[in-house]
Design a protein with these regions (language model features):
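A general structural signal for well-ordered alpha-helical segments in protein cores
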Residues: 24-25, 44, 57-60, 77-80, ...
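Active-site neighborhoods of divalent-metal-dependent phosphate/nucleic-acid chemistry enzymes
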Residues: 68-113
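Short loop->beta-strand "edge-of-pocket" segments that line small-molecule binding or catalytic clefts
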Residues: 5, 36-38, 66-71, 111
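Structured helix-beta-strand junction loops
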Residues: 33-35, 63-67, 90, 108, ...
Length: 132
């Protein structure tokens, strides 16, 4: 498997955590070494929003600069809206940002590395490939 892996905010939180999550840290480190990690604006916003200090914010932004960037295009918003509608009809509730992230992973044919169970729910009904 050599495709890009979009790492959700939940995965990055584990990676940047000072304690625990050794397995996911190892996986993300390997993906970074293989130049297979992707980021997108909504994830960057969530990461920077969660920074506790100015230094931490700048460190996150600097760290993300060397990673593959997946832009959000106009059509992605429309596809995310359709996905949100279809998810709701199946009884699955997801935030607007997470619905957009799932849409981007599907549109760019990336695997999505995450620690949020609702992405697994989405992948059961839609072609979202979750990184295992």
């Amino acid at each position: 498997m050599n495709s890009l892996v979009l790492i959700d905010t939940s995965g990055w939180i584990c990676f940047f955590s000072r304690r625990g999550y050794d397995e996911i840290k190892k996986v993300i480190s390997t993906l970074l070494d293989e130049d297979r990690v992707a980021i997108t604006g909504p994830i960057l916003i969530e990461l920077v929003q969660g920074a506790r200090t100015e230094k931490e914010k700048e460190d996150i932004k600097r760290y993300m600069r060397g990673i593959h960037w997946l832009p959000v295009m106009d059509d992605h918003w429309h596809k995310a809206a359709e996905l949100a509608f279809n998810l709701r009809r199946k009884g699955i509730t997801s935030s607007a940002i997470d619905t957009l992230i799932a849409t981007l992973a599907m549109e760019y044919d990336c695997h999505l590395l995450h620690k949020d169970s609702h992405f697994d729910l989405i992948s059961r009904s839609f072609p979202l490939k979750c990184y295992q």
